[in-house]
Regions:
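N-terminal leader/targeting and accessory segments in enzymes
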Residues: 1-48, 52-67, 76-78, 135
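General secondary-structure edge motif
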Residues: 8-9, 41, 82, 111, ...
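ATP-dependent carboxylate-amine ligase catalytic core
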Residues: 22, 29-30, 34-37, 63-153
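Conserved small/polar residues in nucleotide/adenosyl-binding loops
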Residues: 154-160
Length: 161
């Protein structure tokens, strides 16, 4: 898929996907090679200000010579804003490549009975794949999925802080 097709694919999911179970997300992570396993995470949770805290942490970590990756929501202008490397939105090319990787995995899993991941879950999986490729010093993950997986995120991403 092209970048434009990737974005359309993700927005189309938003209309019909049910929230996946933790088992579904874990299965998809396994099929993707457990991209999160060797990364260090800071998990940012709370009612308000998560995106601001992530931006602040990115700046502080950069000032101290650390590389970062961040996954936040929502985006304001372009969906790429949700995944950042060293404070910069990922490129259209990187977005497209991650979407294609996750889409291929998801389509095979759905054929085996796994629920189609939601838009947010797809973005989460894409972010982890990009983080695995980049291997930043610290990954910043904002709580999402309506807070429903706050504890699960902690389990899935094994936060450093």
């Amino acid at each position: 898929m092209t970048y434009e097709e990737s974005v359309k694919y993700l927005y189309k999911i938003a209309g019909f996907a049910k929230k996946s179970s933790l088992e579904d997300i874990n299965y998809l992570l396994e099929q993707l090679g457990n991209p999160h396993k060797d990364l260090k995470f800071v998990h940012v949770a709370g009612t308000n200000g998560k995106g601001s805290v992530c931006a602040f942490l990115e700046a502080v970590l950069k000032e101290h010579g650390k590389t970062t990756a961040a996954f936040t929501s929502p985006h304001l202008v372009k969906v790429n804003e949700r995944i950042r490397l060293n404070g910069q939105d990922i490129s259209d090319e990187r977005f497209k490549d991650a979407c294609n990787r996750v889409k291929e995995c998801v389509e095979a899993a759905v054929e085996k009975g796994v629920n189609q991941p939601s838009f947010f879950e797809m973005m989460f999986l894409m972010a982890l794949c990009i983080m695995e490729e980049e291997q930043p010093d610290i990954c910043l993950i904002e709580t999402g999925m309506g807070g429903r997986y706050a504890v699960s995120y902690t389990h899935l991403t094994l936060p450093t802080i």
